[in-house]
Design a protein with these regions (language model features):
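Pre-Walker A adenine-sensing motif
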Residues: 17-28, 60-61
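Conserved glycine(s) of the Walker
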Residues: 42
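Hydrophobic anchor at the beta1->P-loop junction of P-loop NTPases
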Residues: 35
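Conserved inter-motif catalytic segment of the P-loop NTP-binding fold
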Residues: 4, 10, 39, 66-153
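Hydrophobic positions on the alpha1 helix immediately C-terminal to the Walker A/P-loop
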Residues: 46, 50
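Post-Walker A helix-loop "phosphate-sensing" segment adjacent to the P-loop in P-loop NTPases
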Residues: 53-68
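N-terminal pre-Walker A segment at the start of P-loop NTPase domains
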Residues: 2-22
Length: 156
């Protein structure tokens, strides 16, 4: 707890708080969110569309304009060819300038076959470093980023 500073309650009563920085509607910057649905529902494509939009691409999803910034997308389940298909489909709807903005702001690093494990210090630390300076980090899919039993409340 030495690195965590307590909130000065009297100061909080007196001073107006800074505005909240939302990465996505109702998702404050610096927090963790999850996109959950059955397999094959399109979560990976939705995550890629969100990543592209936040990386500087056009508004492609309901919710309007979102603050932009660098994004890292780490797919650990789909092979690079599947990601290429998704990017090709997305690119068909983008102008040359929009394609360049997405290419400049979005890093996609496929991890299929790497067996990432966020419970292992070297992976956890590596992911923390990869997230630094990024507006959004996508881990696709969480199940591929650990070896724990996902229905166990302790590790999860």
């Amino acid at each position: 707890m030495a690195t965590h500073k307590p909130i000065n309650i009297l100061e909080a009563f007196a001073a107006a708080p800074p505005p909240l920085d939302y990465v996505l509607p109702n998702m404050v910057a610096g927090t963790v969110g999850a996109l959950v649905s059955p397999g094959g529902a399109g979560k990976s494509m939705l995550a890629l569309l969100l990543a592209a939009q936040i990386a500087g691409g056009p508004v492609v999803l309901v919710g309007g304009v979102l603050p932009t910034g660098p994004v890292i997308y780490l797919p650990a389940e789909d092979p690079p060819t599947a990601i290429h298909h998704r990017l090709h489909a997305l690119g068909a709807h983008l102008s040359a300038e929009e394609r360049q903005a997405v290419a400049d702001g979005l890093l996609i690093q496929p991890l299929i076959g790497s067996l990432p494990n966020i419970m292992a210090p070297e992976w956890f630390d590596g992911l923390k470093r990869a997230a630094e300076g990024r507006r959004l980090m996508v881990l696709d899919t969480l199940r591929r980023f650990h070896i724990e039993e996902e229905n166990a409340s302790g590790p999860m």
